[in-house]
Design a protein with these regions (language model features):
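Nucleotidyltransferase catalytic core that binds NTPs
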Residues: 1-166
Length: 166
């Protein structure tokens, strides 16, 4: 029986840590959907949903990762039902992530009328500290992004910082 996994997030921007979780999910499940939460407050997001999809698609193609990208809004549990998701994939970096993710999981289980499981994948050691917020902070201060984000994301972030300074 085919297992469909969903890895949801804002991916603003997508980091090497996100890509690592996606790659590992593809190795575990038959079908993997990367679910991008539709921006409800575009003024805070660095990238539009379309830009996020494009950046992720470029990475998937370059690295030959077989996953789908879908943008959704509304409740995650509704998207899970719509896509017939069996497994919700969440990445964990630290104990504080676990506490948040456990609340998130229990809330989704309470709201859901369908059966799905949540799988937590530990961040790889080199990405334990990595977050999109940290990457944006580094970019705003003109730091080196190479070890945190793929090249295409780095280029777009540098361009965004230039636009912000105009």
């Amino acid at each position: 029986m085919e297992k469909t996994a969903l890895y949801p997030g804002s991916f603003d921007p997508v980091t090497k840590g996100h890509i690592d979780i996606i790659r590992r999910s593809v190795a575990l499940f038959d079908r993997v959907i990367i679910g991008i939460f539709k921006n409800s407050s575009k003024n805070r997001a660095w990238f539009s949903d379309e830009e996020k999809c494009q950046m992720i698609q470029e990475i998937l193609e370059k690295e030959n990762i077989k996953a789908e990208i879908k943008v959704f809004n509304g409740l995650l549990v509704d998207f899970i039902k719509e896509e017939k998701v069996d497994i919700l994939v969440r990445g964990l970096r630290a104990l504080s992530d676990y506490e948040y993710e456990l609340q998130f999981t229990l809330t989704n289980k309470t709201l859901a009328k369908s059966d799905f499981e949540t799988i937590f994948l530990s961040a790889s050691r080199e990405y334990l500290y990595l977050s999109s917020s940290l990457v944006k902070e580094i970019a705003q201060n003109q730091g080196d992004l190479k070890m945190f984000v793929p090249k295409n994301v780095e280029e777009r972030m540098i361009e965004k910082v230039k636009q912000m300074r105009i």
